[in-house]
Amino acid sequence: MSFKDFDAPKYKYKRKSLVEILKNEGIKSQKVLDAILKVPRHIFVPSEYLDLAYENEALPIGYEQTISQPYIVALMTEALDLKGDEKVLEIGTGSGYQTAILAELAKEVYTIERIRELSEEAKKRIKLLGYSNVYFKVGDGTLGWEEFSPYDRIIVTAASYDIPNPLKEQLKDGGVMVIPIGGRDFQYLYKITKKNGNFYRENLGGVRFVPLKGEYGWKD
């Protein structure tokens, strides 16, 4: 099946409506809005939630994981301030939707998922959409992906009680990380900028993410 076969006009219309909602919610980056308009979110959600694919809400994708609310995807991507030549590390591939948005806007995307089944499904979707700048790994995201570090940008799509040390080390000086930090039930989304080895935080507001599990994350 090709992209044209499943991206029916009704879905394109729904994406346009979603973009208008995101504008009203305060998303300003036209590049981010264009990526949201282009990437078919409906292929990243389970079939039973197809009718909700373009609602501004998070949806279950199995394995106690979710596909993030489109507003949060847009907010996190906007905070990364991508120019098009960056190497990005994504922690938590999930459905692959955020990965596809990043692939639209960055030079290279390295994405890690601890649940093999999710990673394999995401890889199929990314291939179907024709992206050739995404590299997948199954493993502990809190350890990062040292082989290809340092990264210009790091995005973490699960909640941590603090910034995992390996991610601090793998972020290029002058780089930006977007990560939810807090407890299990509520967090704040932070834009972290690394300058001369120091880390500066900007609070982007309250959020709720699934926990980041791993050696430098939650243990259970």
Curated annotation (Swiss-Prot):
It is an enzyme of class 2 (transferase). One of its GO terms (cellular component) is cytoplasm. The keyword Transferase applies. It is found in: Cytoplasm. Its EC number is 2.1.1.77. GO terms for biological process: methylation; protein modification process; protein repair. The active site is at S68. It comes from the Bacteria. The keyword Transferase applies. One of its GO terms (molecular function) is protein-L-isoaspartate (D-aspartate) O-methyltransferase activity. Keywords: Cytoplasm, Methyltransferase, S-adenosyl-L-methionine, Transferase. NCBIfam families: pimt (TIGR00080), PRK00312.1 (NF001453). Belongs to the methyltransferase superfamily. L-isoaspartyl/D-aspartyl protein methyltransferase family. This is Protein-L-isoaspartate O-methyltransferase.
